[in-house]
Amino acid sequence: DIPFARPFIKYTPTWPRSFMPSNQAERNRVAKMKLIPVHELIEGKKLLFVDDSIVRGTQLRETVDFLYENGAKEVHIRSACPPVMFSCKYLNFSRATSEMELLARKIIFELEGEEGFKYIDEYADSSTERGQKMRDAICKEFQFSSVEYQSLDGLIKSIGIDKCKICTYCWNGKE
């Protein structure tokens, strides 16, 4: 059994979602201001943190730094959706001014340059060598003990809606 508890209180009434401000310094400030630690649940613990998505990684970077600063032994990350590979062209939800702001694309570029974008499907798949390299690079950059993403098929299955009725553009670039 893995106990479930919230190792910090996330105070959000006066702060927007951290990925929404267009300025990186403002995103960092918002991310940091929202967290209040519960030391008994952090100090000396191995933590598993689940987030809805990883867009730029702003909130996760701040959260992981915060957890280590408060004594966490390990911090493992799980994303409830696949790696975000494309900016939303329909709702502008991710608010990225460039697709290179998206963490997954940034890491792919660092690993292989423009050539890597030919292999986005492989990078999204944790069972491939490229998929594992991307995850390892993210762990190194963010000091995660591990990181995993939900697969697109797993996400669609969990939603229970026919695939043709779900927009998956930000994950696979398919309209």
Q: Where in the sequence are the language-model features?
A:
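PRPP-associated nucleotide enzymes
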Residues: 1-175
